Amino acid sequence: MSKNKDQRTAKTLEKTWDTLNHLLFISSGLYKLNLKSIAQITLSILAMIISTSLIITAIIFIASANHKVTLTTAIIQDATSQIKNTTPTYLTQDPQLGISFSNLSEITSQTTTILASTTPGVKSNLQPTTVKTKNTTTTQTQPSKPTTKQRQNKPPNKPNNDFHFEVFNFVPCSICSNNPTCWAICKRIPNKKPGKKTTTKPTKKPTFKTTKKDLKPQTTKPKEVPTTKPTEEPTINTTKTNITTTLLTNNTTGNPKLTSQMETFHSTSSEGNLSPSQVSTTSEHPSQPSSPPNTTRQ
């Protein structure tokens, strides 16, 4: 019945807390509006009332929580008193009478120790906790969380009944005295322990720098062949020697110019070109008939 009452009171307190919070929110919103002075005064009074009621509900919550704490302490005190009143007995062996009973109160003091049962495989660390009561103090040792270590599965031991030759890896040569078969089978035990293997780091090979040649073909311009223009052949002036020209003309007195012109013509006949004087003389006298000269070669 007491539990039901506590639940009801808790529910009613929660409801009142929620309603008061809503009222406070509404009143603060209305107060922000520009109302008349009387309305603002009433809203402020309501806000004060709601805040005081909220404080009261908070106090009730705290009181109910303290009541629950006092109930738990009372239960602990009752349990300790029951333990004190009941004095358990244990058996002791007497050589004359056989078995006799004796009380724990004669041996143990006011502090009662409660030991937790521990399994043989798991170790538990005991942590003492003290509980204060009105008259006596009881120390209870509670086991902490056990630390379970995983056991390594050992391989099963093989029976040593069968003595087989494969069990022995080698026969030491110190046993063999004169047996040739033993010397053939035996192995010598090395005196020195095998040393550490020396690890040689590979040395870096020297890198040769190679300059890449230009693979492009060198374009050489062909040499210009000098073109020689044909030069004009030199004109050779050939003068005929031992040639006597005798001009036998009938009319020597008639045209003295004509004879002189013909002489010049024969002297320049070996050359290919005509002189301007010849051209001019021929053009001046086209109509005059020229008598063929009679040339005699000696």
Swiss-Prot record:
Residues that carry a glycan: 70, 72, 80, 86-87, 92, 100, 103, 105, 113, 117, 119, 135, 137-139, 141, 144, 147, 199, 203, 219, 231, 235, 237, 250-251, 253, 269-270, 275, 282-283, 287, 290, 294
Annotated region (Disordered), positions in chain: 119-161, 190-298
Domain of life: Viruses
Region (Binding to host heparan sulfate): 187-198
InterPro entries, sorted: G_prot
Keywords: Disulfide bond, Glycoprotein, Host cell membrane, Host membrane, Host-virus interaction, Membrane, Secreted, Transmembrane, Transmembrane helix, Viral attachment to host cell, Viral immunoevasion, Virion, Virus entry into host cell
Any one GO CC term of the record: extracellular region
Stretches assigned to the Extracellular side: 67-298
Membrane-spanning intervals of the chain: 38-66
Biased composition (Basic residues): 190-207
Ranges of the Cytoplasmic topological domain: 1-37
Pfam families: Glycoprotein_G
Ranges of compositional bias, category Polar residues: 260-298
Amino acid composition bias (Basic and acidic residues), ranges on this chain: 211-232
Compositionally biased tracts (Low complexity): 127-155, 233-259
One GO process term, biological-process aspect: virion attachment to host cell
Family assignment from sequence similarity: Belongs to the pneumoviruses glycoprotein G family.
Protein name, per record: Major surface glycoprotein G
Gene: G
